[in-house]
């Protein structure tokens, strides 16, 4: 799967099913996430297993991305197996937890 011309993802990886937004959110790439949102990507987009960009950002301690996604309409209450808050709590990311609890 090729996401774009500068993507580090392999072109022929049939096992990788991450949408671009979830991928870049998991890496903490604010610039790429902002660009996708400007292009109209749904901030609540999920992968095949229901994992959202907000969950990816929260679980990986990317507070700036969590704030960005929330400001663009990401559903804080969304739950696949866990909510973004629960994932941040399990990973012990105190700032992300505090922010999500403040909403």
Where are these regions (language model features)?
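Intrinsically disordered, low-complexity regulatory segments in ankyrin-centric signaling systems
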Residues: 1-39
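Conserved ankyrin/ankyrin-like repeat signature
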Residues: 32, 64-65, 95-96
């Amino acid at each position: 799967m090729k996401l774009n011309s500068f993507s580090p993802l392999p072109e022929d990886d049939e096992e990788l099913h991450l949408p671009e937004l979830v991928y870049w959110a998991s890496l903490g790439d604010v610039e790429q996430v902002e660009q996708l949102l400007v292009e109209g990507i749904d901030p609540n987009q999920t992968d095949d297993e229901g994992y959202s960009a907000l969950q990816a950002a929260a679980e990986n301690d990317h507070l700036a991305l969590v704030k960005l996604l929330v400001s663009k309409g990401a559903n804080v209450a969304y739950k696949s197996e866990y909510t973004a808050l629960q994932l941040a709590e399990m990973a012990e990311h105190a700032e992300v937890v505090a922010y999500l609890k403040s909403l």
